[in-house]
A protein has these predicted regions:
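P-loop/Walker A NTP-binding region and its immediately flanking N-terminal helices
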Residues: 1-162, 172
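Extended, largely alpha-helical regulatory/partner-binding modules appended to the mid-to-C-terminal parts
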Residues: 9, 34, 67, 71-78, ...
Length: 299
């Protein structure tokens, strides 16, 4: 339930769990804020869940109430170890893991190592890890997360089941933000949500963080204008005027308008990005007029 917009991965995991073919190592890749670490924790819960009655097996729908689920959720499970490779890149840190791998899990079904930003490990650290990945003990599982999959050696990747977490689709993101806003009892305009969705570029974490800022910025209903100001975007009406001048070939007026927007505090880079968005929107609407009604592609 914590995973938004990752149906293909959930389906693959469910099939693997049901067939009792759980990989020894997983690697999650995707842009920031798509749920890599969340997924890693859910998989860890699923592998060690014993169900509310204490007799359940591995599942893709962990109960969330058994001792293992609760301990993993609170980050205090003795058999589920999380390590941030960004701050512990050396071979000594990995050796520590390798030495502890031989010992069985203290209380859970599996001993699980979650290594975040795994691409930050040094070459020597990867080499040390490789031997364990080649011949892992039955009771050990590795879950790696990375935003830079190209920096992970092929020898490591070939021993992992890989999941590419997609950018979250705009309509899914808007539905998520509406749900959060309703839970917070916050009023926020639909076009304001569309602006936040575009700015987040498919990252749920960025979107929820921007939504928090927008709600605290707005008194009463948060409008698109308030969100635009918060994001440092140029005034949309003035961008449309500028676009019209460019289309007319009126260079003098366009440069004068751009200078005026700059004087009023608009970031020239943001203006150019907005112009590119308007150009894209006009092109899309010319080809598929119905797109004009879609809030996620509006100018």
């Amino acid at each position: 339930t914590d995973l938004v917009g990752q149906e293909a991965m959930v389906r693959t995991l469910r099939n693997a769990f049901e067939a009792d073919r759980i990989a020894q190592a997983f690697v999650m890749t995707g842009i920031r804020g798509t749920g890599k670490t969340t997924t890693a924790r859910i998989i860890a819960k699923g592998m060690n869940c014993i169900g509310a009655d204490g007799s359940g097996g591995p599942t893709t729908e962990p109960c969330g109430t058994c001792e293992h689920c609760v301990a993993i959720m609170e980050g205090r499970h003795v058999d589920v170890l999380e390590m941030d490779a960004a701050s512990r890149t050396g071979v000594d840190d990995i050796r520590e893991i390798i030495e502890s791998v031989q010992y069985r899990a203290a209380s859970a079904r599996y001993k699980i190592y979650i290594i975040d930003e795994v691409h930050m490990l040094s070459t020597n650290a990867f080499n040390a890890l490789l031997k364990t990945l080649e011949e892992p003990p039955e009771h050990v599982k590795f879950i790696f997360a990375t935003t830079e999959i190209r920096k992970v050696p092929v020898t490591v990747l070939s021993r992992c089941q890989r999941f590419d977490l997609r950018r979250i689709e705009p309509d899914v993101m808007i539905a998520l933000l509406k749900k959060i806003a309703a839970a917070e009892q916050a009023e926020i305009a639909a076009d304001a949500l569309a602006l936040i969705t575009r700015a987040a570029e498919g990252s749920a974490r960025d979107a929820t963080s921007l939504l928090d800022q927008a709600i605290s910025h707005g008194a009463g209903e948060t409008s698109a204008e308030q969100v635009r100001a918060m994001l440092g975007l140029a005034d949309r009406g003035r961008v449309m005027d500028l676009f019209e001048m460019i289309m007319r070939g009126d260079a003098a007026s366009a440069l004068s308008e751009l200078g005026g927007q700059y004087a009023d505090g608009a970031n020239p880079l943001a203006v150019m990005r907005d112009l590119a968005e308007v150009t894209h929107w006009v092109s899309v609407v010319k080809i598929t007029p119905d797109a004009g009604e879609d809030p996620t592609v509006s100018p």
